[in-house]
Amino acid sequence: FRPALIVRTKGK
């Protein structure tokens, strides 16, 4: 899984 994906969801 890409950590960047999680960060983007958190920012949203």
Curated annotation (Swiss-Prot):
The keyword Secreted applies. Expressed by the skin glands. The keyword Kinase does not apply. Keywords: Amidation, Amphibian defense peptide, Antimicrobial, Secreted. One of its GO terms (biological process) is defense response. It comes from the Eukaryota. The modification Lysine amide is found at residue 12. It is found in: Secreted. GO terms for cellular component: extracellular region. Has antimicrobial activity. Belongs to the frog skin active peptide (FSAP) family. Hyposin subfamily. This is Hyposin-J1.
